[in-house]
Every structure is written in C-alpha cells, then in structure tokens.
Amino acid sequence: MTPPLAAIVRLATVSRALILALSLLARLLFRPYDTSASLHPPCLSSPSFPSAPSSYNSTAAAISSLAVWDGVHFSRSAECGYEYEQSFAFLPLLPASMALLSRTLFAPLVPVLGYRAVLVISGHILNNVAFVAAAAYFYRLSVLILKDSGAAYRASVLFCFNPASVFYSSL
C-alpha cells in the first residue's frame, strides 16, 4: 500500500470512529427523531435463530435502537426474511451478509445481546468496512482522474469528513 493510500485508510477509520462516538453521544443527549427502531413486531414465521435473550438488557435495546430508517427494514429482512411486498425494495446482499456475519463471527454475542442487536452490530461493521474500502478506491480513482495526488488526498479527506458521512456508516 502506498503511503498516501495507507494514510487515507487510517483517516477513514478514524472518521468512522469519530462518527460512531458522535452518534452515541447524540443518542445519550437527545431523544431520537426517528422512532421506527422501537417498532419490533414478531416475525410472521418463526425465526430460525433466537431473537432475544431471556434477560433483554438496556445495552441490547440501545444497540437495536441504532437501526433507523431503512436499517429497520434491512435488519428485519435479515431476521425474518422477506415477509411483506414493500420489503422487496431492500435487496438481499446486505441482509444476507448481516445474517451470515451474525450467525458465524458474532454468534457468541447472541445469547448476551439477542439476535436483533447482533444483526445491527453486523450491519454497522459491514457498512463501516465498506466505507473504508470506498475511501481507498475513491483516492485511487481521484489520482487517476486528477493526475494530482495532493488534490486526490484533499478530496478523500472531504469524502471522509463531509456532513452526510453519518449515512455512510449507519445501518
């Protein structure tokens, strides 16, 4: 990895940690605008994985509440499958990847946090890894197009720290 590319990967990783910290701080200080995370009806068919531990703790509830807007639909599709017609708008790669990650690598967390919270963690990790990869490829593409590594670096920094980048990391 070339030194500027390694710097972009580090910068993108730091920006995701900063966004996560700011998101959690905002969750603690303010009431959420979108309350769709609290809507959690049971699956129409019985899920193949346990949905919640017997003692559902506040940590699991806080993690599950991080799935808002479209994240609610992605996590529901990962947990229950495609139950309703409107859920077909959310293509299966992300829900399938979330389910695979939560059933393999993060399976030991399911008895502690519950399946839904582990799905949300899996989705956040997948999206943040994809963001770091996108920042690296954005830098490489910018170098090819702009023919100036300094301008490509500045463009990548702006990509990592733009105000809308919170959406790149959320489920």
PLM features: residue spans?
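Hydrophobic transmembrane alpha-helices and immediately adjacent juxtamembrane helices
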Residues: 61-67, 87, 124, 130
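Short acidic/glycine- and proline-prone juxtamembrane loop motifs at membrane-interface regions
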Residues: 25, 164, 169-171
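Residue-level signature of the transmembrane alpha-helical core
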Residues: 9-13, 17, 96, 124-129, ...
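A structural signal for well-ordered alpha-helical segments within the folded catalytic domains
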Residues: 15, 72, 91-95, 99, ...
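Start-transfer (signal-anchor) and selected internal transmembrane alpha helices
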Residues: 1-55
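Catalytic phosphate/metal-binding cores of nucleic-acid and nucleotide-processing enzymes, i.e., regions
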Residues: 17, 102-106, 142
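Short hydrophobic/aromatic helix or loop-helix immediately within or flanking a transmembrane segment
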Residues: 65-115
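Transmembrane-helix signature of polytopic, membrane-embedded enzymes
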Residues: 110-122, 133, 138-161
